[in-house]
Structures are given as C-alpha cells and as structure tokens.
C-alpha cells in the first residue's frame, strides 16, 4: 500500500481499492487456472471439431443476449434508473460465470450425494479431457462449461428484468450469487444429471433448451422477488394503475432484435452437436418469434386501437 500511496494521485481509499482488485486480477491472469490433465489423446475427428466449434459459436450468441437484456431493461425503465440497470446486467453475468465455475457446475453435474436430489464433485470446474470424449465426438469439458455458464447467467438476468426499478444493486448481487451458485445448479441437476425428475413414475420429463431449468427457475425467482418487493414507485396512485413508459424505446427495440439473434445460439445450440436437427430448431425458433410479434401486434391493436411497441417487444 505504501508503494501505491507514493504514486501521484493515489489516495488511501484508491490504494485499498487496487489491493482489493489484485486477487481478481491474478485469477484472470491464470494464477488459479485449472489445467487439463495430460494424457495420450486420439486424433481429432471432423465430427468432434464440428460439434465443439458449433457449441462455441452458440455460446457466444447466448452471451451476446446479455447485451439485448440490458438494452431492453434500460430502454423500458425510467431514465433515472438506467445506469443502475446497465451496471447490474454487466456485473451479474460476470458474477454468475465465476460462481458457476467455482461450485455451480460441480453441483449440477457432479457425483450423487443424495440420490436424485443433490450432486457434488468438489470445488472448481475440472477441464480434464479424456480419450473417450474425443473418440465419441463429444464435447470438450471447457466448451460445455462455457455453454452451461451462459445459461446460468441468463437465469439471473431473467430475474433482473422482473425486479427492475425495485431493488438496489448490492442486494441483487447477493441474490444473483445464491441463485447461480446453488439454486439454479441444484434444480438443473434434477433433470440434466439424472435427478428425480427423470424418474417420476412412468412420466418422462423432457427439458429442451432450458424451458424449465433456465426460464422457469428464473421466472419463479423473479415472481417471488417482485411479490416481496412490491410495485415500482409511482405505479399506483390512489389505488389506480399508472402507466410508466420507457424512456428510450429505440434502445429497447434494438435489444429485442439482439435477443432474437441470440436465440439462434440458445435453442439450436441446445442440441449440443452439429446434426440434422439444428436447422429445424432454428426455423422453429424463427417462426415462434415471428408469431409472437404478430400476435402481440394484433392483440394490442384490438385492445388499444393501435399497435403497442411495448407489447410487441
């Protein structure tokens, strides 16, 4: 600290801030990076390369969705809260990925602790690549981790939109940490790691692209948060509902289009392979989004006598 304080322009508070950031910077440089265990691996097949490359591209699209979420939320809120929402979306995704790397992935895909209910494989994500993975044209653990971590971040971002303009930055960060490190991974293990949802009598539970694991978990968490926090300030005056228009619908519209693009990573990428079903899923995603936009336009025109951009988004 004495060295930092000796530098011109550094106050005591700034010196403490830089010292606090040092461990995180070291982690980013690779001090805590877990390297794969070396073993003799077979030759990489075309299918193996295609599957992993496709999932990596899909992961980038899913991560890019966070820009869409941030723009939709910021554009639909009041101007005074826009900076808080943007900061929240950016930081929470970084926090979610770190929490999922530290313990979340292990809780979701680890070994059974309580059969069907709880799994754990130790702290920190293990990136070990095996010969079997390559021979079966499977996914490299690091690629699979990145895709799943992007899903975890999405679950937290869903909640962010539902409690927008209702919660302070610090409190939401704590909640997002608990959600992405424990709640989401445990719920995900119930289906994607052979948990109890796979053995409910004769009924087969199928979750494609996180319909329940990501979106339902995020939605339920957001609903509880909205109920506990109550309505936004100014939403009700003398018991009457007041419209709170967004301050920048251009940004919100652009965010919606970015989300549309991101869905081509979220849904087709959930095939976890480059196969014949990927284009089919992409077409279904396109028609679903188009149908939703058309339906919202028609309904808002009937109820409000004119199209409502907020409803279309």
Predicted regions and their residues:
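Hydrophobic alpha-helical transmembrane bundles of multi-pass membrane proteins
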Residues: 2-313
């Amino acid at each position: 600290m004495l060295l930092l304080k000796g530098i011109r322009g550094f106050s005591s508070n700034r010196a403490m801030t830089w010292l606090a950031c040092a461990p995180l910077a070291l982690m980013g440089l690779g001090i805590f990076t877990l390297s794969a265990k070396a073993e003799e691996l077979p030759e990489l097949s075309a299918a193996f390369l295609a599957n992993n490359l496709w999932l990596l591209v899909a992961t980038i699209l899913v991560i890019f969705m966070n820009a869409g979420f941030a723009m939709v939320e910021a554009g639909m809120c009041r101007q005074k809260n826009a900076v808080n929402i943007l900061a929240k979306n950016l930081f929470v995704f970084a926090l979610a990925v770190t929490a999922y790397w530290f313990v979340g992935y292990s809780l979701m895909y680890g070994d059974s602790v309580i059969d069907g209910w709880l799994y754990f494989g130790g702290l920190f994500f293990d990136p070990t690549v095996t010969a079997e993975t390559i021979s079966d044209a499977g996914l490299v653990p690091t690629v699979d981790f990145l895709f799943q971590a992007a899903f975890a971040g999405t679950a937290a971002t869903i909640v962010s939109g539902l409690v927008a303009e209702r919660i302070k930055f610090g409190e939401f960060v704590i909640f997002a940490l608990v959600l992405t490190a424990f709640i989401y991974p445990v719920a995900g293990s119930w289906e994607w790691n052979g948990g109890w949802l796979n053995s409910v009598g004769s009924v087969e539970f199928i979750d494609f692209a996180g319909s329940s694991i990501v979106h339902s978990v995020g939605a339920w968490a957001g609903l509880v948060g909205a109920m506990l926090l109550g309505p936004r300030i100014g939403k009700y005056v003398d018991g009457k509902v007041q419209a709170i228009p967004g301050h920048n619908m251009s940004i919100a519209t652009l965010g919606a289009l970015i989300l549309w693009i991101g869905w081509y990573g979220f849904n087709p990428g959930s095939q976890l392979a480059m196969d014949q079903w990927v284009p089919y899923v992409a077409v279904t995603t396109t028609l679903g989004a188009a149908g939703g936009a058309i339906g919202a336009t028609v309904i808002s025109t009937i109820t409000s006598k004119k199209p409502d951009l907020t409803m279309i988004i």
